Amino acid sequence: MNDLSRVSVVLPSLDPDDKLVAVVDGLLEYGFSDIILINDGSKPENLHYFHDLAAQHPEITLLHHEVNKGKGAALKNAFRYVLQNRPDSLGVVTVDGDNQHHPEDTRACCEKMLETGCVVLGCRDFSQPDVPPRSRFGNRTTSAIFKVFVGMTISDTQTGLRAIPASYLNQLAEVYGDRFEYETNMLLAFKDQGIPFDEQKIRTVYIEENKSSHFRVIHDSWRIYKLILAHFFRYTLSSLASAAVDIGGYSLL
């Protein structure tokens, strides 16, 4: 088994409840010993979860945002922290705090990352009958748009479980976006920057139909689709301009 002591868990959280405690307990049980927990501007009544966990577990490093900056900002903050404070790091794994990522799956993604040197996406099976309709529709739609407009085959575009080798952290810390759109921009960066990625099948878990998610279906989905379409048109126009220059140059010969 690969050594997980040099892989940092990146765990952003906003207004947590007891599920965050279960996530941390599971990660520790499965051998993770470096957890970077980010309080992304939580309400005062939720802050005790962060303080209690950090006091109980020396494996936890606690980062604070005084105001909510967004999931993307929290992830990038943690990536920069690892780059500055974990010189021997082999990578990170991003995990959501709603207890929908089983720690065994988290470990499997990390082990595959260490074996292949690729970014590993933990991908759910949306054909399962207990998947909420909005989640099934949203993920299938986004996967289809990625396939058609970007040329990337990704079975779970909205997964928050991502194991990332340390060699790519600097690049991904500079990717644009501070909120949920950052995770989409990260996937587009794989395409633009030639970052290799692979998938790992994981459990499909939805607790109370994902009611604890801070993802706003219409608002955040539209922001994601705009990013993908903008990426498509940017590259299409670039290709057309390049072709026009080639044709113009040829006509002068």
Predicted feature residues:
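Acidic helix N-cap motif at the loop->helix transition within catalytic regions
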Residues: K19-A22, P44-L53, E104
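A conserved acidic beta->alpha catalytic loop
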Residues: N39-F50, V67, N99-Q100
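Cell-envelope/extracellular polymer assembly enzymes that use nucleotide-activated donors
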Residues: R6-S8, D34, N185
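Short, well-formed alpha-helical segments that are part of the catalytic scaffolds
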Residues: D15-E29
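Hydrophobic helical membrane-anchoring modules
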Residues: M1-D3, V175-G248
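Conserved short acidic donor-positioning loop in nucleotide-sugar-dependent glycosyltransferases
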Residues: D15, D40-S42, K69, A78
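Acceptor/aglycone-binding surface of glycosyltransferases and processive sugar-polymer synthases
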Residues: E66-V67, A73-Q84, P103-F180, I207-F215, ...
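Short beta-strand-to-loop acidic/aromatic patch adjacent to the donor-nucleotide binding site
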Residues: R86-Q100
